[in-house]
């Protein structure tokens, strides 16, 4: 979480090595007490150190993933058989007294609760020690846990090669089981590689070398994403990369641009050639210095291309700073394996927590019952089981430093009200821990005011005790008394209280449990004061209480008087969050002697702690109390944690053992953020992922600004902090491989945890369609444009099945993420590596550069290019307006952004400005002077900067609303269908009429002649005139028949268009009203958000003013603090009033604008209806002329060739592409206007 030492880190991590004894194998008796079985087996480890394996009685090979091994134990820490038959077979009870030294227990499991125990007994002497130590080294190897993608694929191959049948062949069913998401694809891939693919068959190991396995994976999991990357690099259709292309790809895409080129020089051609030789197997490509697609894929999954540098995994932080400078991996109620109310307690949980890197464990100790009177550990007044204190201490002594050499803190919650048993507790600590127990403070770090705490390096291998400490009184009262204060010694305000005695056994149903409701989750709660305590101790306050407080509440408040949490001002407020069930008793001299650098005291105030300046005093906060302090005094909390330790623990109402988000309290520098290790929820996953780094030591150095006394830090800052280089990060999820054993859809979430301004949740890809083998997303990247404190930020990439089931995740420190294309091998909830599931992502990590400085940054990166560009622009301008004017214009252009920064801001014509967050100008929000808001102009600027203008959505934009688009589409379809129907009828009638005219002319009945068509001049030819008259009447009947049909159709179409127009108007009106309602709702939310932002600015200003005032002299400070508070109240009231007035005016402007939109809509409707009616009438009046032209071939002045004429002259159906289609387009134009 914080940076490493300056300079190039010398890597201390070593790859896993398997000694010859483990490779060759040793004889053991494997026994299982539950199954009453014992078998002679040969234990072996494969040469890569992936699996522990042996052959069972059924001649099938059993394997155990070494990465799942959590511990190995020998001697008295190994499990002893209890079954008489097994004991007899193993030789217990015989002459050999060294049998315990031959026992070995291997503890394995996916998490600290669900563990299994494999028991072995060596046949030969001196075998167990080697096996136990070497297996544990392999299991805890950091490089093995963070292996490359290629290594994990080789691990899957190794498992298939080990699990052979009785004939020494690889069963096909094992391959189908490993890739069970799509068995048909597996069979096809096996067949394409020339291997047996039937489930009942098997494969000879020599037919299945690693090269064939890689070919099988390529057939099984096609990689179009790799092809696309090659194309982008420049392969351009060729199946390979040249040496130059590979070198450019690594230096430009894979290289972190923040690296110093002297300490970390770019890749040279000789180094690129070595990569080709390592990953390319095709000799022809090798000879030409080329890398094939397969070789490139192997390079992407190689150890050189990890998402993190190995330095982040190694112990790379400075371990010589005081203890308060570190985040310390901490556990709450360590003994519990399930919920807080019921379930078993376990000694094993202490071992698992310590092995997992925990450096602070909790022990809730209660008084033992006669006759043994052995103190025990349990969760008081619940149904959880008990475990002996001695067993717990022995487990801690055995496991404390197996995975980390740095100090362990034992957080005692002491409920043992027996001096004898407290003395026994102290004796157990001394005898069991021996020299590891730190009793006397170090000479360099005495327990004095102003002396910092020792460092983890100073305390390596030491155990520290955190317990209530008794300070030697000035009176002569015996020190061994642990009795509770007699009633007559209590304050008079508590004279009516009954002195409830503490039960010796905290079980449900005990007589005193009724008077002490709640949970005892512990943190120095209810510490009783006796006459032996000094009268002026830190955190002591008046015992006066309201006399009408109910009896149990008053007792509980009295008991909590010396607890470490801050006392609430309301004496009637329940203490459910603290979960107090009973008071913690005072320590005897024996237990007090063991306390030194972690002395718990009740928290009173940050100011009181600063005055005392005792770094060895620490306080505990329940999460709710800590949240209050974090919200109220974040900067003071950070300052407090620079010198002293603080412990945060879950509230008592978390009876399901859920966890709070630890990032909240890391943000203010809290060191001991205690979580329930048995619950692997998101907070615990984040804790496990974060503490994986720095060599899994359990200690992470806090960022520099959280440690330096000369720097102040506001965790709620939203601007760049001077001295901290902010980062920018872009993450693109490209594809996944073998993500599930089921054929389901997969999606990926990308979250960032850090300061409030840095936290982003949740980016998410789409869900793949039933493909968990090789889903490809390749969507737009997820941007984190400004990470203010990258050393405190973590990136979480998690995959889930479409139903929400967890697949795997990875927690990455933002400050260490490499740029480029990388595989992310996923982990389970307990941060153990998964073999096959992986994601291919692309990242861009860089230093954050504000938009205003981008041009300057580019100019610094490439100054020659920048100068050339400026010269080129100057020459281009000189050609147009003359050189002197061009220079002046160029200078003006360069100065304008500095003179008018506001002019560069683009206008925001978004339809819904309520969705846009308000812009905060840097001046008023960051100023800490008391006069920053004094002038009215500045105050108005503050209101204006907070206030976002809200305008009604224009009518033109609402016409593009999806509801309107959908309605127009339906109406257009309706009109098209009506047109087609009318066209068919018109075409049929027109054809019949034209056929009738043609037939009349053919028969000669009414054949017209020139004299018949003109005025009759020959009175004698009456017959011809009669025929002409009959022909004209026939024509008129034909025309009238078609005209009546077309007019009826035109009326129907006009009615339909008018109906559509009214529908569209009504729908648009509904859209307008819905939009206005939504705007009002969002405006209300915006008002609240703006008030909160204003209050936050004013509070921050007040806190900054108070911080400045504290540095002044005492008599001036008090006066100034009073003035600051008075001014803050006045300023807050006035500012909020002005903001409310501005918001009221904005609301009125919005209402007026919305009324204008509605008025515009109402005024448009009659205009559109009249326009549409007129157009339809004009079309109807043109019908007689068009029909006569179609049937008779007449032309009229000003009448062009209509569609019916064209249809008649070309022999086509009238109306097939003319008038009706024109009406269609016109109706569509009418609808488009709405």
Curated annotation (Swiss-Prot):
Origin superkingdom: Eukaryota
Cofactor section: Ca(2+)
Feature: compositional bias, Low complexity: 488-515, 925-936
Residue numbers of Phosphoserine PTMs: 474, 490, 495, 537, 927, 1105
Activity regulation comment: Activated by G(q)/G(11) G alpha proteins in response to ligand-binding to G protein-coupled receptors.
Family matches, as SMART domains: C2, PLCXc, PLCYc
Assembly description: Interacts with SHANK2. Interacts with LPAR2.
Designated name of the protein: 1-phosphatidylinositol 4,5-bisphosphate phosphodiesterase beta-3
Composition bias type Polar residues, residue spans: 579-588, 888-907, 1222-1234
Keyword Nucleotide-binding: no
Transmembrane segments: none
Organism field: Mus musculus
PANTHER family to which the protein is assigned, alphabetical: 1-PHOSPHATIDYLINOSITOL 4,5-BISPHOSPHATE PHOSPHODIESTERASE BETA-3, PHOSPHOINOSITIDE-SPECIFIC PHOSPHOLIPASE C FAMILY PROTEIN
Name of the gene: Plcb3
Interaction with SHANK2, as annotated region: 1231-1234
Catalytic residues (UniProt): 332, 379
PI-PLC Y-box domain boundaries: 591-707
């Amino acid at each position: 979480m914080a940076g490493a030492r300056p300079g190039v880190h010398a890597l201390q991590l070593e790859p896993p090595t398997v000694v010859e004894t483990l490779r060759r194998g040793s004889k053991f008796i494997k026994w299982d007490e539950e199954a009453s079985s014992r078998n002679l087996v040969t234990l072996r480890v494969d040469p890569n150190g992936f699996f522990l394996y042996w052959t069972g009685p059924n001649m099938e090979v059993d394997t155990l993933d070494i990465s799942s091994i959590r511990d190995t134990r020998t001697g008295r820490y190994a499990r002893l058989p209890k079954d008489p038959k097994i004991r007899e077979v193993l030789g217990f009870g015989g002459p050999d007294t060294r049998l315990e030294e031959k026992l070995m227990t291997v503890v394995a499991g996916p998490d600290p609760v669900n563990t299994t125990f494999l028991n072995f007994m060596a046949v030969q002497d001196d075998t167990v020690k080697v096996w136990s130590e070497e297996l544990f080294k392999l299991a805890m190897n950091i490089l093995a846990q963070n292996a490359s993608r290629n290594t994990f694929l080789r691990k899957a191959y190794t498992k298939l090669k080990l699990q052979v049948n009785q004939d020494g062949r690889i069963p096909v069913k094992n391959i189908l089981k490993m890739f069970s998401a799509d068995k048909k694809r597996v069979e096809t891939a096996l067949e394409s590689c020339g291997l047996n693919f039937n489930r009942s068959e098997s494969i000879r190991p020599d037919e299945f070398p690693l090269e064939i396995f890689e070919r099988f994976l390529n057939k099984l999991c096609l990689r179009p994403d790799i092809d696309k990357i090659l194309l982008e690099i420049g392969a351009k259709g060729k199946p390979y990369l040249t040496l130059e292309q590979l070198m450019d790809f690594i230096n430009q895409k894979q290289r972190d641009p923040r690296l110093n080129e002297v300490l970390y020089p770019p890749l040279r051609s000789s180094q690129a050639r070595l990569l080709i030789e390592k990953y390319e197997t095709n000799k022809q490509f090798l000879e030409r210095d080329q890398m094939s697609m397969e070789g490139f894929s192997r390079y992407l999954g190689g150890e050189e291309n990890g998402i993190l540098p190995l330095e982040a995994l190694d112990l790379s932080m400075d371990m010589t700073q005081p203890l308060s400078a570190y985040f310390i991996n901490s556990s709450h109620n360590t003994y519990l394996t399930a919920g807080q109310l019921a379930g078993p307690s376990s000694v094993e949980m202490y071992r698992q927590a310590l092995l997992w890197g925990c450096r602070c464990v909790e022990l809730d100790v209660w008084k033992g019952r006669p006759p043994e009177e052995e103190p025990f550990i349990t969760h008081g007044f619940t149904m959880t089981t008990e475990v002996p204190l001695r067993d717990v201490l022995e487990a801690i002594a055995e496991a404390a430093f197996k995975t980390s050499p740095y100090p362990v803190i034992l957080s005692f919650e002491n409920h043992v009200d027996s001096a004898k048993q407290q003395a026994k507790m102290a004796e157990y600590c001394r005898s069991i821990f021996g020299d590891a127990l730190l009793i006397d403070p170090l000479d360099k770090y005495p327990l004095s005011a102003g002396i910092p705490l020792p460092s983890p390096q100073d305390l390596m291998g030491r155990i520290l005790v955190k317990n209530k400490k008794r300070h030697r009184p000035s009176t002569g009262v015996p020190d061994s008394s642990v009795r509770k204060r007699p009633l007559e010694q209590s304050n008079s305000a508590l004279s009516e209280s009954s002195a409830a005695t503490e039960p010796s056994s905290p079980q449900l149903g005990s007589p005193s449990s009724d008077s002490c409701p709640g949970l005892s989750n512990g943190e120095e709660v209810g510490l009783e004061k006796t006459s032996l305590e000094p009268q002026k101790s830190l955190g002591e306050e008046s015992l006066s209480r309201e006399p009408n407080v109910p009896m149990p509440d008053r007792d509980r408040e009295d008991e909590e008087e010396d607890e470490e949490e801050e006392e609430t001002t309301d004496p009637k407020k329940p203490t459910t969050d603290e979960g107090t069930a009973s008071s913690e008793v005072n320590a005897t001299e024996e237990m007090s002697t063991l306390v030194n650098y972690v002395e718990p005291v009740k928290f009173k105030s940050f100011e009181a702690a600063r005055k005392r300046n005792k770094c060895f005093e620490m306080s505990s906060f329940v999460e709710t109390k800590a949240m209050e302090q974090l919200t109220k005094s974040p900067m003071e909390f950070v300052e407090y944690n620079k010198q002293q330790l603080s412990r945060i623990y879950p509230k008592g109402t978390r009876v399901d053992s859920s966890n709070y988000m630890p990032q909240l309290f890391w943000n203010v520098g809290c060191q001991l953020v205690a979580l329930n290790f048995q619950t692997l929820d998101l907070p615990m996953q984040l804790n496990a992922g974060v503490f994986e780094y720095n060599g899994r030591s359990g200690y992470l150095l806090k960022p520099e600004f959280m440690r330096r006394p000369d720097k102040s830090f506001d965790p709620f800052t939203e601007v760049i902090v001077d001295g901290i280089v902010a980062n920018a990060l872009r993450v693109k999820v490209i594809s996944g491989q073998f993500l599930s054993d089921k054929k389901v859809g997969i999606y990926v979430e990308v979250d960032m945890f850090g300061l409030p301004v840095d936290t982003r949740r949740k980016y998410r890809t789409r869900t793949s369609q039933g493909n968990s083998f090789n889903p490809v997303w390749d969507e737009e990247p997820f941007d984190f444009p400004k990470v203010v404190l990258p050393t405190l930020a973590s990136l979480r990439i998690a995959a889930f099945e479409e139903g929400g089931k967890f697949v795997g995740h990875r927690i990455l420190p933002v400050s260490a993420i490499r740029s480029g294309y990388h595989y992310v091998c996923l982990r389970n909830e307990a941060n153990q590596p998964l073999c096959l599931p992986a994601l291919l992502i692309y990242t861009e990590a860089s230093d954050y550069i504000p938009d205003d400085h981008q041009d300057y940054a580019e100019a610094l990166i490439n100054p020659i290019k920048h100068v050339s560009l400026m010269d080129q622009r100057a020459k281009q301008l000189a050609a147009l307006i003359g050189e002197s004017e061009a220079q002046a214009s160029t200078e003006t252009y360069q100065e304008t952004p500095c003179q008018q920064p506001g002019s560069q801001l683009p206008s925001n014509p978004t339809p819904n400005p309520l969705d846009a967050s308000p812009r905060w100008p840097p001046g008023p929000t960051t100023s800490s002077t008391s006069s920053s808001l004094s002038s009215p102009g500045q105050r108005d600027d503050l209101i204006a900067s907070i206030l976002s203008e809200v305008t009604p959505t224009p009518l033109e934009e609402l016409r593009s609303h999806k509801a309107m688009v959908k309605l127009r589409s339906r109406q257009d379809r309706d009109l098209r269908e009506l047109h087609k129907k009318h066209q068919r009828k018109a075409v049929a009638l027109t054809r019949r009429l034209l056929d009738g005219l043609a037939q009349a002319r053919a028969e000669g009945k009414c054949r017209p002649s020139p004299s018949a068509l003109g005025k009759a001049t020959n009175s004698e030819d009456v017959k011809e005139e009669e025929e002409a008259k009959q022909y004209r009447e026939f024509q008129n009947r034909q025309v009238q028949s078609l005209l009546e049909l077309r007019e009826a159709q035109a009326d129907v179409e006009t009615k339909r268009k008018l109906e559509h127009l009214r529908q569209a108007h009504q729908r648009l009106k509904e859209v307008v009203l819905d939009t206005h309602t939504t705007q009002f709702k969002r405006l209300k939310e915006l008002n609240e958000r703006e008030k909160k932002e204003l209050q936050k600015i004013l509070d921050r200003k007040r806190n900054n003013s108070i911080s400045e005032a504290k540095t002044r002299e005492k008599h001036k400070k008090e006066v100034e603090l009073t003035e600051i508070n008075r001014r803050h109240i006045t300023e807050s009231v006035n500012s909020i009033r002005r903001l409310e007035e501005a918001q009221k005016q904005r609301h009125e402007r919005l209402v007026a604008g919305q009324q204008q939109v509605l008025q515009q809509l109402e005024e448009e409707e009659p205009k559109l209806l009249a326009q549409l009616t007129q157009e339809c009438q004009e079309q109807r009046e043109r019908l007689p002329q068009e029909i006569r032209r179609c049937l008779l071939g007449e032309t009229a002045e000003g009448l062009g060739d209509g569609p019916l004429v064209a249809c008649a002259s070309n022999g086509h159906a009238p109306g097939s592409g003319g008038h009706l289609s024109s009406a269609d387009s016109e109706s569509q134009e009418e609808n488009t206007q709405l």
